[in-house]
């Protein structure tokens, strides 16, 4: 079985050669991220369904995600990712990852149901594909940001903030207003020429918004709830202090931290970044658009 995905212009191919059934697939919203082109993949993942995981010697620990999620160890062949079952905290999948994060060989425990033996693609996508994609993205000057993303015919907005800051709420309001909500939880930002582009991802928040679309980023807002709507300018240092904690960083690859900081500095220098405090009222959509229109008229 083959599964081809496209996320933020990265093509990812999963191949399970034994052709076991894939359970709970495609799970929403990954269906809209399926890639039906024949273009060469950027990340290749080969999967073997097994009764028992192979025994690999685990070298020095590179990263521990804690909370019973996964660990990354160094090996002579690259990196070994140990994915843990969230219920038993025992390994349920192993993956050997090449040093350039373009190939991954995976062994996953089979799942037994009344209809027979199979495998669960979501146990490969989370976290194995995320690790490869995040590393490649950071190495190539992109960002995965804890944020919502919205496209209108003339604008592209990012709303970033900690959990509970209002990303899904704003997404609901903009969706009702007819805008295209790319995600209410995680957005990818990549630069194309002189333009920063925002890309939807299949990782969703409470609103379950996800679209495989992209467009130019025109405004970035650091958001929080308040008694009334208000937009305030921020200094570059203040923007960085608010955005950095919302970035998903590949802490297992310290070589990319410098490039990530350079990407953030470039973004802050070229895209208007402001603080948005808003009351939980739908008219915040009109407020934002009116304030930005007024600012544009004053500037011109």
Question: Predicted regions: what is each one?
Answer:
Residues 1-158, 162-163, 176-180, 187-300:
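A noncatalytic interaction/capping subdomain that flanks phosphate/NTP-handling catalytic cores
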Residues 170-171:
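Post-Walker A alpha-helix
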């Amino acid at each position: 079985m083959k599964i081809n995905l496209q996320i933020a212009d990265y093509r990812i191919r999963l191949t399970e050669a034994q052709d076991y059934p894939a359970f709970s697939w495609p799970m929403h919203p990954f269906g809209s991220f399926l890639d039906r082109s024949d273009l060469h993949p950027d990340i290749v993942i080969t999967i073997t369904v097994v009764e028992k995981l192979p025994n690999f010697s685990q070298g020095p620990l590179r990263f521990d995600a804690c909370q019973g999620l996964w660990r990354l160890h160094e090996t002579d062949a690259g990196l070994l990712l140990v994915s843990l079952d969230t219920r038993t905290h025992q390994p349920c999948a192993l993956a050997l990852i090449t040093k350039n994060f373009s190939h991954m060989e995976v062994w996953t425990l089979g799942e037994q149901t009344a209809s027979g033996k199979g495998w669960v693609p979501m146990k490969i996508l989370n976290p194995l594909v995320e690790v490869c994609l995040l590393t490649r993205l950071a190495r190539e000057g992109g960002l995965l940001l804890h944020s919502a993303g919205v496209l209108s015919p003339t604008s592209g907005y990012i709303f970033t903030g900690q959990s509970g800051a209002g990303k899904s709420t704003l997404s609901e309001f903009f969706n009702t207003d007819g805008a295209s909500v790319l995600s209410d939880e995680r957005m990818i930002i990549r630069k194309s020429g002189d333009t920063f582009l925002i890309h939807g991802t299949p990782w969703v928040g409470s609103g379950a918004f996800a679209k495989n679309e992209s467009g130019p980023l025109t405004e970035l807002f650091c958001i929080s709830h308040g008694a009334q709507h208000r937009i305030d300018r921020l200094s570059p240092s203040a923007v960085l202090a608010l955005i950095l904690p919302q970035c998903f960083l590949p802490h297992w690859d310290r070589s990319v931290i410098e490039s990530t900081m350079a990407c953030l500095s470039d973004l802050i220098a070229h895209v208007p970044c402001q603080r948005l405090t808003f009351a939980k009222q739908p008219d915040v959509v009109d407020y934002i658009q009116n304030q930005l229109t007024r600012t544009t008229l004053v500037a011109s």
